[in-house]
Amino acid sequence: MQKSGVNRNPSLKVAIPQAQQSLRRLGFCSQIATGGSQQSSPIVFPEKRNKKVKASSRRGEVTNDPQVKPKPDEHRIDIGGGDEKSDLLGSLVYAGKLVLDKRKSASGKDATEIQQPAATDISIKKAVDAKLTSSALVWGSDMLQLNDVVSVTYNVGLRHFTVHAYPIGKGSCGLSCFTKPKRSRKDFRFVAPTVEEAVQWVASFGDQQCFINCLPHPLVAKKQASSELFSVPIDTPPELVFRCKSAPKMLVILNPRSGHGRSIKVFHNVVEPIFKLAGIKMEVVKTTKAGHARELASTVDINLCSDGIICVGGDGIINEVLNGLLTRSNPKEGVSIPIGIVPAGSDNSLVWTVLGVRDPISAALSIVKGGLTATDVFAVEWIHTGIIHFGMTVSYYGFVSDVLELSEKYQKRFGPLRYFVAGFLKFMCLPKYSYEVEYLPAQKEDAEGKIRLEKEAVDMQDLYTDVMRRSSREGFPRASSLSSIDSIMTPSVGELDTCSSTHASTEPSEYVRGIDPKMKRLSSGRRDVTAEPEVIHPQAQSTTPNWPRTRSKSRMDKGWMGLTSVQDPPTRCSWGNTGGQDREDISSTVSDPGPIWDAGPKWDTEPSAWDVENSIELPGPPEDIETGLRKQSITPIFEDKWVSRKGHFLGIMVCNHACRTVQSSQVVAPNSEHDDGTMDMLLVHGCGRLRLLRFFILLQTGRHLSLPYVECVKVKSVKIKAGKNTHDSCGIDGELFALHGEVISTMLPEQCRLIGNAPGRHS
């Protein structure tokens, strides 16, 4: 009976799940082990088999449903359909049938054969379900990320199209644990059932910001006989006309010395083919001297690089291009030109940190995909000379700047290892560094993530009541005052092109000092006061004692002199983002409490009847603040916000972002972001080799901030002055400068745009 039952239903053995079979075997063995009677086994087996047959029949009925086809005892993970909330591939763009043609390129075949590529392809090769989502192309069990796709090539009138991509290749089984995955070019040739479906597929790729290279029919390209051209489509399908984007124009500035001379090979062998696939029109210029990239960026015709400037090299060439763009005759043009980065140097901290790109192929793909990432810029101004230099990564003083200076001697001999050699030599003969540091702390954020404004002494309601009381007696100001206030908040092109006085002042420029928006309103309202000679009180610390501290010019003359004087672009340029000024506080200190000069003309030249003793006054010396309670109540006290540090420092680093190094674990400023409007200042207090060695050892693992002598502060402006017997040098984004006197670093929010989309915030 048992044998006949098994023979009649041979499929039962396959239908029974493995888990249930093991349970039945255990039950059968337990019966034999317990010495059960033989008459129990023929009674038990038919009942269990009948139940299993019924269960299998029910399962067969369920699987016959065309909508639900679950397999028994199988875990399913639906990543493309079903529940929309569990869709991991984004929204659906287009779906249909496709066949992957794995044959080699048919470029050498006859055009007629290309026109009908193996008419039996669809019948012989089974077409699979394919769909294009906002994140990937899925066909069968294969998937291709859209971030890896460069372009799509399509010949008019054909059923096939080619997808050009650079996916991450899988290493061999034995070496995959030791080698990093690399990207390589792969061309996927798909065949659609009809020409119309092929056009729809290509148009869908165009909707996902993929470059469409639409070519004419092969017969038209080869100029076949006119009799054959009557049946050949010539015009581009209307679905693809608007998807075919115009070729972007970019200027490529290549530093042939970057990366120990390998930047040329990286560009021509790796990056240039990707740009050509994407249809980018390039003009490649190789730098020949220091500062060549800055000259190109400051004088290049904007029509030649309307879509951006690509920098191939390290952080040094990027810094030159940035300073060239921001010192153009029209600064608005400089801000509008984005910068693309291809890492090919020994240090590329900017692109590693902001865009999360570490290899040239990924950098080229991010440039091809487009997108813009706004980045803050900091300005370093030399107070004595008025020279301004911009940066986007970090400015450093002390041991690191000395290592940078010493490494220039070993650049040709050691290449990227020159920093290690110079650091070791400088470590063995470590000097003592002393600095005077004053910084303006950034405003803290509350629990809701909004900036919490500090309580100020100005009561705007009382100020409004006071102004209305005087206006009822003297009349409202003229309508031109509104335009004057608006001109301060949004400077015109003419104002942007102007620079400051030819004589270098001891005070920082307006946007470097970070004037507060309320102070601008107060100064704008004070312009109706009669022009009077002003006397600046002598200060405790005068940076230039040879210059007299008395000025007989009126506020009007002083303001216009700063706006109309013309000087070289790099020196005391008054250009700056007003949005960045509005977010910053005034940077006057106790040691330098001079008044704020009005930067605009007076509204009236005739005397006004306003009470001079009750006029709205700007912050003045401490003697003026103590003269009356009313003046003290309406004058913001910004001197108390500045914090001073003086003593020995092994190093001072002012970071604009996290500043990741070659090793991903090395993060100089973990809490800094490229677009938060603040800078992170690291102070390494003290002196001695042991402290310096501990700092660099813990820097390898990102635990250097736990040291008791390391201080990290978020700041908006920093003043640094080297002490006596201290080697006065500083580095800005890998460029070395001499530190003569005091310098001030100030943040300019979102004054540069990088080509590419930034990933999520780094933890």
Swiss-Prot record:
Keyword RNA-binding: no
One cellular-component annotation, GO: membrane
Superkingdom classification of source: Eukaryota
PROSITE patterns assigned: DAGK
Record's note on what induces expression: Not induced by low-humidity stress or by abscisic acid treatment.
Domain DAGKc: 245-384
Residues reported to bind substrate: 313-316
Keyword set includes Aminoacyl-tRNA synthetase: no
Entry keyword set: ATP-binding, Kinase, Nucleotide-binding, Transferase
Catalytic site positions: 315 (proton donor/acceptor)
Span list, region Disordered: 34-81, 561-603
SMART domains, per the entry: DAGKc
Residues the entry annotates as binding ATP: 255-257, 287, 320, 345-347, 418, 733-735
Composition-biased stretches (Basic and acidic residues): 58-81
GO-annotated molecular function: ATP binding; D-erythro-sphingosine kinase activity
A Gene Ontology BP annotation from the UniProt entry: sphingolipid biosynthetic process
UniProt tissue specificity: Expressed in roots, stems, leaves and at higher levels in flowers.
InterPro entries, per the entry: ATP-NAD_kinase_N, Diacylglycerol_kinase_cat_dom, Lipid_Phosphate_FormReg, NAD/diacylglycerol_kinase_sf, YegS/DAGK_C
EC number: 2.7.-.-
Function (record text): Involved in the production of sphingolipid metabolites. Active on sphingosine, phytosphingosine (PHS, 4-hydroxysphinganine), D-erythro-dihydrosphingosine, D-erythro-sphingosine and trans-4, trans-8-sphingadienine, an LCB found exclusively in plants, but not on N-acetyl-dihydrosphingosine (C2-dihydroceramide) and D-threo-dihydrosphingosine.
Protein name per the record: Sphingoid long-chain bases kinase 1
Gene that encodes the chain: LCBK1
